[in-house]
Design a protein with these regions (language model features):
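Structural preference for solvent-exposed beta-strand-turn elements
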Residues: 1-299
Length: 302
């Protein structure tokens, strides 16, 4: 394999897939990124067997082929290269020669034949969303995802689609976040729990104004956008019946500026108990009072 790519485009693609790679792997090949030619592009793929990401970068293909290289080391190298053309050539025994500007490297690679297959599986019914809308929905729910590995079904966000609505739900057993948005066109009812790591990667790569497509099959979540594909194995298990705990009526309601509430919370939480940081809300006509208390430190009111 011999290819020529723009260093900046290659770096951007490498950064997108790099976070999928886990620092510690039981299989050495999973610490690598797969480089493979496809027509006039170079595809970069990384996976941890639960989440996979693939990015296509425009390239001049002198000789087609594939190879895998250490994702961490490759990223460290490319970050330091000048903004110029980057040449990669696979040599004997899976060695890879790299040249960019006046710099040259030779890296030890591993055969692409040992790299796990990353595919979209049976994804077929695609749902189109504005990337910024999806990112905002994720931002408004991911904070409530549980980090307790013993409650596996809560370690992700429940994606639910029904007719003309998409709904995202997350809970850690103490707090719950639910966000809904309307869809442009009706879609078949489907749902799945997308793992926290995949959610974090999606939030990181979407939102620059482009439309994205998502699909949920029996055991896989797939997101695609121009030149980018992300796949994740759905979390097995049953998500709690959150509708039972969402109040149907609200006897007390107050409308307040989000900025003012955020500022008030920051002021009083300085003196809240460290472990759970509780803040007491007291409602009265035309007034919301916030109180925080720590027996070792003191009390705050806003």
């Amino acid at each position: 394999m011999e290819v020529h790519v723009d260093r900046d485009a290659f770096l951007k693609g490498l950064q997108m897939v790099h976070n999928v790679v886990e620092p510690r792997q039981t299989l050495p090949i999973l610490a690598n990124v797969l480089l493979e030619t496809d027509k006039d592009t170079l595809r970069l793929t990384a996976t941890d067997l639960e989440v996979g990401a693939r990015v296509s970068v425009p390239a001049k293909i002198a000789t087609g082929g594939s190879i895998t290289l250490s994702a961490r080391k490759l990223l460290e190298i490319v970050k330091e290269l000048p903004a110029a053309g980057l040449a990669l050539k696979v040599q004997e025994n899976s060695w890879v020669a790299m040249r960019c500007g006046g710099a040259s490297y030779k890296l030890v690679g591993l055969s692409a034949s040992d790299f796990p297959a990353v595919s979209t599986g049976a994804a077929s019914a695609w749902i189109t969303l504005d990337g910024k809308v999806l990112r905002d929905m994720l931002t408004q729910t991911i904070f409530a995802v549980s980090h307790d590995e013993s409650r596996y079904a809560l370690n992700g966000i429940l994606f639910g689609v029904h007719d003309r609505e998409i709904r995202l739900v997350a809970t850690d057993g103490h707090r719950l976040a639910l966000v809904t948005r309307a869809l442009v066109s009706p879609a078949s009812a489907v749902s799945g729990i997308v793992p926290r790591k995949a959610v974090q990667e999606i939030a990181r790569i979407v939102g620059s104004g482009e439309d994205v497509q998502i699909a949920i099959s029996d055991n896989q979540f797939v997101l695609q956008m121009p030149n980018v594909l992300l796949m994740a194995r759905l979390i097995e298990g049953t998500f709690p019946n959150y509708e039972q705990v969402v109040p149907k009526a609200h006897p007390h309601k107050i409308v307040v500026s989000r900025g003012a509430l955020t500022a008030a919370l920051r002021r009083v939480s300085v003196l809240s108990e460290e472990r759970t940081k509780p803040v007491k809300f007291t409602l009265s006509p035309g007034l919301l009072k916030l109180t925080a208390y720590s027996p070792e430190i003191g009390r705050a009111h806003v």
